[in-house]
Amino acid sequence: MELPATKLRIGLVIFPLILLTIAPILYLFFGYPLYYSTSTYKHLSNSSSSSAISSPSRYNHSSSSSDSYKTEDSEPSSYDNDYDDTYHDPKSSSLHNNDRLSISSSNGHHQVTPKKEHRRKKRKRKCDIFSGEWIPNPKAPYYTNTTCRAIHEHQNCIKYGRPDLGFMKWRWKPKECDLPLFDPYEFLEIVRGTRMAFVGDSVSRNHVQSLICLLSRVEHPEGDSQQEFNFQRWKYKTYNFTIATFWTTHLVRAEETETGPTGPNSFYNLYLDEPDPTWASQIGEFDYIIISSGQWFFRPLFLFDKQKRIGCLYCYIPGVRNVGAHFAYRRALRTTFKTILGLENFKGEVFLRTFAPSHFEGGEWDKGGNCLKTRPYRSNETELDGMNLETHSIQLDEFRIANRDKNRNDGLNLRLLDVTQMMLLRPDGHPSRFGHKREDKVILYNDCVHWCLPGPIDSWNDFLLDMLKNRDLKRLKY
């Protein structure tokens, strides 16, 4: 009988030792994952609900260039989309950006829904009105070359026999919302008692003519016939509203040289640190300023800074540094913004209208190039590249810098009227050879730079009105 008792005593001693040996191993394989999964669930559930509350503070309103808009307004808009409290930043993968959180554990794959998700309130988010497609609009156009007398001859495509009329029957549709068509009555009420200046080259003038034509359904303005169109003012007496144009080729001071070739290949002296006085001396009296430029920077230039020549473009003169067109363009934009930001007591709104690409095919403008398309591109059929891409990038960069520096003038508001992508899709919207008589001898025989009226440029005023109605909106990221 002693043998079993001896075995029992030995077993009572050895069994606890075995348990002490394997217990840590069992804990590592089973106990710790269970504890980790439970504690992580509690932590994520708590942090998710707090993140959803605090996430609006992550919005950056001061830096502006992205493809999204955001507002705290509770009032719905015709082009709002619902979304939850979490800001869905495509560049961020933080946990609070997910509606459902995925956690792996030893027990399998758990889908964890943050606490109080059902209590989240819907907010309204403004979409990017500049990202979209052209869609058919059988109701267009809203004026003709007979109802509007402001159309420049070179953009009067119907008068000069353009055979296809489909280019007029499109409207811009943003991807995630709707863009209301231009309402001339609403526009004139918003700008009642104000002044609006367009500063730029002939494409800026093209924009002004489009606006005047759209407003002609309400009122024809009184213009000073003694003034050259490039520096003209139009007065809408009923609304006490004035439109003015300031012609400037480069935004900064430019002088055509007396030596060298003449015509479109003539040289200009460009003073990169001096704004063009034709607009800089008068612009402070306006409430709205729309600035634009671009086409004139791709021609022969001598560049000056502080009255000293620092280089040239397309000059090929021994001993003179040949720089790129975009160097001059960047400096000119920076000087322009610096001038406007430095205006004393100016509290208006300044719009940078971005570059509208030309569409020459088969050669350059002076080498037989033409634009014969009759339909818009889809957004997946073409892309911005080369000089157009670099020009647009410079505009975004300089706008961002100016927006950062505008705190010196608290009342001034900078806005980006980004038409580049939507106009890239409209190779069919140019006059081509239908801006003059066939036998006329003109410098730009096939015009693939300017835009027919009526035509796609009318949508720029859809944007302008929408932005005037929504002054509190900022582009979120650049």
UniProtKB/Swiss-Prot annotation:
Subcellular locations according to the entry: Membrane
Extent of Low complexity compositional bias: 50-68
GO cellular component term of the entry, any: membrane
Transmembrane segments: 10-30
InterPro entries the UniProt entry points to: TBL, TBL_C, TBL_N
Keywords recorded for this protein, A-Z: Membrane, Signal-anchor, Transmembrane, Transmembrane helix
Compositional bias per record (Basic residues), positions renumbered to this chain: 112-125
One protein family per Pfam: PC-Esterase
Biased composition (Polar residues): 92-110
Motif (DCXHWCLPGXXDXWN motif): 447-461
Chief localisation class: membrane
Region named Disordered: 50-125
UniProt motif (GDS motif) ranges: 200-202
Membrane topology type: Single-pass type II membrane protein
GO MF entries: O-acetyltransferase activity
Extra remark: Contains 2 motifs that are conserved in esterases, but it is unlikely that this protein belongs to the catalytically active pectin esterases.
Family per similarity comment: Belongs to the PC-esterase family. TBL subfamily.
Described function: May act as a bridging protein that binds pectin and other cell wall polysaccharides. Probably involved in maintaining esterification of pectins. May be involved in the specific O-acetylation of cell wall polymers.
Name used for this protein in its record: Protein trichome birefringence-like 20
